[in-house]
């Protein structure tokens, strides 16, 4: 009887431990963080601490499943070439604003995005970067299209 209990216990615990290990490895990876300055006519408007997403895997995951994103923080999506960009909010549970940024750091568009929305938000022209922040942050700190993003 005792050996049956041990066998049943082992059959239960081993899969449970494997599931726990898998889930914990799926939690938010820490990406490199850089401080970005946003300027207008040489004057500092705001700074944001942005996680830098460069690999395809990092960009695909983005801010999915995050429960919060503090004010003044965000994620910068970096691409090798200029392109029309489209983002959607599948599995993203926090409202975000996105700035589409040209190769030289100029903000081309700022748009709001809504949780779990499958509709794409698209840049109006080819850009090199996209910066996601908490929804309304750009407006709240006075950032506008035409402002310059500088990566420190």
Regions inferred by a protein language model and the residue ranges of each:
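Intrinsically disordered, low-complexity regions enriched in Ser/Pro/Gly/Gln/His and often acidic
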Residues: 6, 19, 80-81
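A general, composition-driven signal for non-globular sequence regions
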Residues: 5, 23-24, 53
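Bacterial N-terminal signal peptides
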Residues: 13-24
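Bacterial N-terminal signal peptides that target proteins for export
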Residues: 2-14
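Intrinsically disordered, low-complexity peptide-like regions
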Residues: 2-4, 18, 145
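Compact, glycine-rich, soluble single-domain proteins
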Residues: 28-152
């Amino acid at each position: 009887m005792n050996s049956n209990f041990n066998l049943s216990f082992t059959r239960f615990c081993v899969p449970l431990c494997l599931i726990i290990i898998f889930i914990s490895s799926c939690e938010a990876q820490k990406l490199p963080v850089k401080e970005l300055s946003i300027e207008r006519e040489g004057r500092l408007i705001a700074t944001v601490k942005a996680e830098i997403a460069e690999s395809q895997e990092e960009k695909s995951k983005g801010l999915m499943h995050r429960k919060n994103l503090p004010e003044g923080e965000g994620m910068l999506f970096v691409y090798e070439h200029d392109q029309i960009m489209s983002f959607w909010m599948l599995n993203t549970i926090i409202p975000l604003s996105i700035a589409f940024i040209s190769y030289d750091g100029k903000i081309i568009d700022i748009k709001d995005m809504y949780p779990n929305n499958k509709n794409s938000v698209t840049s109006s022209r080819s850009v090199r970067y996209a910066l996601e922040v908490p929804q309304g942050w750009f407006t709240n700190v006075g950032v506008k299209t035409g402002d310059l993003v500088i990566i420190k």
